[in-house]
């Protein structure tokens, strides 16, 4: 057996011994009838204590004689004979406990406290003071074991480093890694700030079906499920768009939804099959209004959540306080591939040849508009680092967007890019029922030709349009990618609490 194998075997034995030891301690607690008490109440969290009392010196704290109670997980413990220091971690952060034998009821220190393990959840009551190094601490007069941890924590010095374990056992990641906890705190704050931003502008939050008979609103491969009672195949939604626009037809002129979408596609650092989107629809507006709203939203979120309009992502700094760049799709192609003959983008055969020359495999079902879009994706998208709006998307790849009045081959649509990736997609909505019916039929034809991401024909949505959809603009923003930017996270798995993972064998 190699040295590495021997070390691994010894670690497994040590781990099993620790599990056995902890279970024996729990068994003893059960016999005493105090295994999982539920009568301890705290009056402060660690962050509340630091915020209120960090500025006070020890003399002032002693004169105030402030008694507090806290509860949380024991992360570290230094036993020094008759006294110990404990690091307690709770939802707000960490606070130090000073545990002295003579300050506790008889027997608690030696017979109970010293037998507890790291990871145990405890309650503590005592008075505030500061150590000689100036650290705010609690001099404990009462200690309670609230939950016995049967498994040891990850490496207490280096945190949890194994990426697979971090994602599969997110609870361990949250215990061990401050950055992970902060990422999801920021996520929650951003979602709350988005809702506040939208409601302040007269939008109503709504909920639309997650299971749909006809999946629509995006070009993507759906998940299929079966409704037993109805004996009906249904689809997990790929987007809420068509239902939200039905609500605008019904008279709700400003609506938004923050919820999950599901797409049966690949997994990557940018893609998870289950992801969060915000979609909004605003009557009597066009895509220019949404460009202004998007800029304002990102500026507001940065200021309110991070306290600055400058956001650092990797080696880049984005200043949301400045106007965002705006380019048409063709301008972006020319900017990032200057040798492009723009006339080639007006001819199918020339565009096809150009696409193939830069490594794009052109599918039989693609028209000129799809080819031009793929060329843009290949030559320009990765260069769109600073906040940029790309406009004038071809009608072929925009089956729900309003055609441009001057050039009907393009639409009044934009996509919003930051850090070389798409963050949002918005457009003036197509509200011509006959045009929509024709485009749905084109999608049906594309699906028949082999495009499994083409849309289904939604007859009821066409019927809704026949009752009249007012001039409307719609916007979708990928919340997960937004959170990646605001938390400087470089894989989508870092911002989704429980990302999709292949089952362990």
Swiss-Prot record:
Catalytic activity: tRNA(Lys) + L-lysine + ATP = L-lysyl-tRNA(Lys) + AMP + diphosphate
Cofactor detail note: Binds 3 Mg(2+) ions per subunit. The third one is coordinated by ATP.
E.C. no: 6.1.1.6
InterPro entries: Aa-tRNA-synt_II (IPR004364), aa-tRNA-synth_II (IPR006195), aa-tRNA-synth_II/BPL/LPL (IPR045864), Lys-tRNA-ligase_II (IPR002313), Lys-tRNA-ligase_II_bac/euk (IPR034762), Lys-tRNA-ligase_II_N (IPR044136), Lys-tRNA-synth_II_C (IPR018149), NA-bd_OB-fold (IPR012340)
Keyword Transmembrane: no
Domain of life: Bacteria
Binding residue positions for Mg(2+) 1: 415, 422
Binding site for Mg(2+) 2: 422
Complexes and interactors: Homodimer.
Entry protein name: Lysine--tRNA ligase, heat inducible
Source organism per UniProt: Escherichia coli (strain K12)
